[in-house]
Amino acid sequence: MDPYKNRPSSAFNSPFWTTNSGAPIWNNNSSLTVGSRGPILLEDYHLVEKLANFDRERIPERVVHARGASAKGFFEVTHDISHLTCADFLRAPGVQTPLIVRFSTVIHERGSPETLRDPRGFAVKFYTREGNFDLVGNNFPVFFVRDGLKFPDMVHALKPNPKSHIQENWRILDFFSHHPESLHMFSFLFDDVGIPQDYRHMDGFGVNTYTLINKAGKAVYVKFHWKTTCGEKCLLDDEAIRVGGSNHSHATQDLYDSIAAGNYPEWKLYIQTLDPENEDRLDFDPLDVTKTWPEDVLPLQPVGRMVLNKNIDNFFAENEQLAFCPAIIVPGVYYSDDKLLQTRIFSYADTQRHRLGPNYLQLPANSPKCAHHNNHHDGFMNFMHRDEEVNYFPSRYDPVRHAERVPVPPRTLGGKREKCMIEKENNFKQPGERYRSWPSDRQERFVRRWVDALSDPRVTHEIRSIWISYWSQADRSLGQKIASHLNLKPSI
Amino acid sequence: MDPYKHRPSSAFNSPFWTTNSGAPIWNNNSSLTVGARGPILLEDYHLVEKLANFDRERIPERVVHARGASAKGFFEVTHDISHLTCADFLRAPGVQTPVIVRFSTVIHERGSPETLRDPRGFAVKFYTREGNFDLVGNNLPVFFVRDGMKFPDMVHALKPNPKNHIQENWRILDFFSHFPESLHMFTFLFDDLGVPQDYRHMDGFGVNTYTLINKAGKAVYVKFHWKTTSGIKCLLEEEAIKVGGANHSHATQDLHDSIAAGNYPEWKLFVQTIDPEHEDKFDFDPLDVTKTWPEDIIPLQPVGRLVLNKNIDNFFAENEQLAFCPAIVVPGVYYSDDKMLQTRIFSYADSQRHRLGPNYLQLPANAPKCAHHNNHHEGFMNFIHRDEEVNYFPSRYDPVRHAERFPIPPAICSGRREKCGIEKENNFKQPGERYRSWAPDRQDRFARRWVDALSDPRVTHEIRSVWISYWSQADRSLGQKIASHLSTRPNI
């Protein structure tokens, strides 16, 4: 008898109820009592097992991106970029790779409306022949802060007040008033794109700068872009109240129903690349996650397409237990020194170990679909089958060897230990350009949202003045407009 | 140096940032990198500690009642019931006991709108001189099922579909079509009361039948009622969409803002009592949680008042970590053989051990405020200070003794091991009476909500017929009304 053969699964259902040890249950309606009306006996093991499992159904939600929906499909290469990367899954046009995607909101809890003004997560796990590749991004191309050391405090400011549990603008505007690097992100969040219509009608971005490396070891910086073929659509504030008030899961339902109806959402993948030798020629730092790369100088190059054509079988197994991590890459793709990405490499796996346990990468949705081998598997809920006697390395009894060497970025690292900001901050140019690119009604809505936020009675005169100063530095007329609505004089 | 003196607290804040071991942090903005733009060093312990704590901020939400708000105040006895109970906190009019209360919705997740049609939790923890007393009830006086064996499946049916994560009527109406005992609960849930305006404008109930015992050992069955002095107010469907769409935390905010403004919500406590000698004289079983006790025969007796006059200091400590359990009673209050209550005695503590750890009753919000003593404290996160050498019982070195004996119900339990339903089900009378007591517009709204639910395209003809038959048995005109809207003929 092989204990690993009949793994627990819907495929091995008995036609009658049983306990988890397989004992038959002849009455699943009534507890075991003293007589028909007396108290329940402790020996009612079936009842205790049923309740104890139920009592433990919830695991910690994600500290961010708790609310989300997932779906499966494939990625297909449409354009050859093998001169840029040796990644196997990108080796030639026509190559398809299975994947799972999770869309999410960021700040609020599981169950929160999917109509809140918030970035949307856009995380893709490619099950490649060289192991999984997680491209863990958002629907906005930039981020609030450029060093992950600020991330926990940033999230605390955006989350509900720890006393009242209400999200409050004075806390958000206080925190970010110390970090003008956030202006560019706010030019997305407070724009109409701050509330996407649903998960199908939005673009995605890798957000951070990554590195592509080809077989010869040549590295280029890269940014990833997913463009929806459904068109970008957003909800204005009044629509969001009605949609979210009627169904707080409208985007989850939209994704599921679309796929069930055979209306498969699709995104095109594009990249922008930058030779590290040219990185000093820009007026911004290409490792600064608060910047976009101008598409007229660094054009979008098509790579492939992603189609979501299959709904998940079970929400808990393939959404709640689905774990992404930007550290999970494949040969031919590497990190950059982007300080936000560097911290993400640590945090994601760390938080999944808390949520799911040390063996979370064994869970079906997370495990690689290629052959793999190491000695990291004992501990809570190891359900892997291994029959080796040698579980150490190196050994003269075990022929397993190192994999073939994969190229890593060749640049020499040098410098003192530093805790400092980057030099080329350039916080105001891109948000100003973005604002000026809009028609006047879109500018008006943006201004109104800022006026609303700054009108929180607990926002002080000092904080209001700082923000007016910041927006004036991005665009003089924008700062003046906000100030005049608030009856304040801009400080510069 | 006493390691138990300076417990971590806002009261011992340093004026500058430190790590959790107390080391000063001289730069909380930037990670430790190789040069100004290089990768982050593993030795940046401060960064790793900050991220690792952040990564673990969430704990499992409650499997039910995840979404809620809490507040503190006091309970004051206004009427003497010391002839019914020897409970110290009920000993005489004028006696005040500090309390913490948690209101909640039941089915949806932590961030879900507080405008959904759902029962509302109403849980009160009394910090008495004889230990804590948890009265863990709801805003509706009855419950869906009368044996807790059905509870996990019931919640699964009410929760979102495990595939698409959307709450669906066909699953709810399928499950409950097997249990007509749920009809009475549905006359509350699908009534206007199903969406309270907020937590202040609703009543509360102990729901289950408990036992009061006086000094002489005489026991009476008891039901607890909390009557709001603010008046009961509900949201109709259109209002709920607007309120919940505009603020998914409106009830949390209302409770917090009311108390902050000095507008303290208040409830009066009433009891109904039945002498167990008379329990066979009714056409229902008084241990059946799907029944109310008619107030014309068993009148409400006033006991005291509950005033909430203080907001919590911290949402995580006093809401997320706040743990209730109906097993937590004081001398003079006891359980009954109500099969729902019997299972709750096990489940609540079991679930909190999963969520919070084995020492959850040491957490400040959960710990008794009276002197207490036992040997149950080691294990994860034991932070109690104990300096005894004898941590076993009995001992000739330790003078600790048994407490004074307090009375428990004197009834003799006898009977065979049984797994069965109760005899006097009487599922249709009370729901029918309740329906007939309403004005016609309220009856219409109730019928319309049933027609909407039964119109789910996945509700089969069989399920529709079962429900029409059930409602016809409660009230013939109600069944006909639903049937005619659905163009289905009633079966009886």
Curated annotation (Swiss-Prot), chain A:
Keyword Transcription regulation: no
CDD domains xrefs: catalase_clade_1 (cd08154)
Active-site residues, as the UniProt record annotates them: H65, N138
Keyword Heme annotated: yes
Family the entry assigns: Belongs to the catalase family.
Quaternary structure and interacting proteins, as annotated: Homotetramer.
Protein name: Catalase-3
Lineage of the organism: Eukaryota, Viridiplantae, Streptophyta, Embryophyta, Tracheophyta
From Swiss-Prot, chain B:
EC number(s) reported in the record: 1.11.1.6
Keyword annotations of the record: Glyoxysome, Heme, Hydrogen peroxide, Iron, Metal-binding, Oxidoreductase, Peroxidase, Peroxisome
Listed transmembrane segments: none
Active-site residues (renumbered): H65, N138
UniProt subunit comment: Homotetramer.
Protein family (similarity comment): Belongs to the catalase family.
Protein name listed in UniProt: Catalase-4
Recorded name of the encoding gene: CAT4
